[in-house]
Design a protein with these regions (language model features):
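Extreme N-terminal, non-catalytic leader segments
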Residues: 2-59, 106
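Short, hydrophobic alpha-helical segments
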Residues: 291-299
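Glycine-rich phosphate-binding loops of nucleotide-dependent enzymes
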Residues: 126, 168, 181, 289
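Helical mechanochemical/support elements of P-loop NTPase systems and associated helical scaffolds
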Residues: 46-49, 68, 72, 93, ...
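C-terminal boundary of histidine-terminating zinc-finger modules
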Residues: 270-281
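Walker A/P-loop phosphate-binding motif and the immediately C-terminal alpha-helix
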Residues: 52-92, 206
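Phosphate-binding loop that captures ATP/GTP phosphates
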Residues: 80-140, 146-154, 158
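Conserved catalytic-core segment of NTP-binding enzymes
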Residues: 162-163, 169-267
């Protein structure tokens, strides 16, 4: 047998071995998946006293999702109906809600041994940032993370809450899957910036919620433009109308078009959100209109 024929013979047999190996594994995985699907999803537990649960999510980090979550919560709380609102920060490894909301105290325990949300500006907050020291890193594996999330979710006395705003970590991982399968979610808001790299992840986020049967309330285009404070020239630093076009493509509603405003940065860093520090500013009015769209929907 020639060297060329020998190589062909071995390549053919090795290829067939791999095909048999992987097709065998695929068959096993397929059967396992079918068995799990027959069992059905875990039964969802209601959150006592909570009427609406809204997830604030993003396909990638750095799009201002937590800023959107904080200011939306405050804007809903300031609607004429005087809704009772709380924020749950589920970003275990990088919680930012305590800084933005200027809350530092550990939650107290109520008579039922459940945590009481730490309240500021009329909005209750629960976050991992309130349960560990500020300089302490959370270095946990999946099961511990899920345990902590369940503790914050079901181990908190939410009282009579009209809207629970859940600030989720970026991406489409276990935390999103767990929240959507264990509690009744009223809807999800997806946050994106206009540039293509962020929009590409929006599709994944919307697809994830569609697969989990979670209603997507709409898309928020954040950091859409920058208005110069000296000459009032508007600059689209990350492209123009990218998220708006994405919303049209996906058939979902564009809930808000939020500009880059220095007030949002300074107010967030100081722990006095713009809805509190500058309630009559143009960007605060954008959030009020956004909140009105959420509250006017039948959830």
């Amino acid at each position: 047998m020639s060297l060329r024929a020998l190589k062909t013979f071995y390549n053919f047999n090795i290829g067939n071995c791999f095909k048999r190996l992987y097709s065998s594994k695929d068959d096993v995985l397929k059967r396992r998946q079918e068995e799990l699907m027959k069992r059905g999803l875990p039964k969802k537990k209601p959150l006592e006293g909570v009427k609406n649960v809204i997830l604030i999510s993003s396909g990638k980090g750095g799009v201002g999702k937590s800023t959107v979550a904080v200011n939306l919560a405050l804007a809903i709380a300031r609607q004429p109906q005087a809704f009772k609102v709380s924020i749950l920060d589920t970003d275990i490894f990088g919680p930012s809600i305590p800084i933005m909301m200027n809350v530092n105290d550990s939650p107290l325990l109520g008579d039922n041994d459940k945590m009481l949300p730490v309240t500021n500006y009329g909005v209750g907050c629960i976050s991992m940032g309130l349960l560990v020291k500020e300089e302490q890193a959370v270095v946990w594996r999946g099961p511990m993370v899920m345990g902590a999330l369940n503790k914050m979710l079901f181990g908190t006395d939410w009282g009579d809450t009209d809207y629970l705003i859940v600030d989720t970590p970026p991406g489409t991982g276990d935390i999103h899957l767990s929240r959507s399968q264990t509690i009744g979610v009223s809807g999800a808001v997806v946050v994106s910036t206009p540039q293509a790299v962020a929009r590409a992840d929006v599709r994944k986020g919307v697809d994830m919620y569609n697969k989990m049967g979670v209603r997507v309330l709409g898309l928020v285009q954040n950091m859409s433009s920058f208005l110069c404070t000296n000459c009032s020239h508007k600059t689209h630093m990350f492209g123009e109308d990218g998220a708006r076009l994405m919303a049209e493509e996906l058939g979902i509603r564009l809930l808000a078009d939020i500009p880059m405003d220095p007030l949002l940065v300074t107010s967030g860093d100081s722990g006095v959100p713009v809805l509190v520090s500058h309630p009559e500013s143009s960007v605060a009015k954008v959030y009020k209109d956004f909140a009105n769209k959420i509250c006017s929907q039948k959830l």
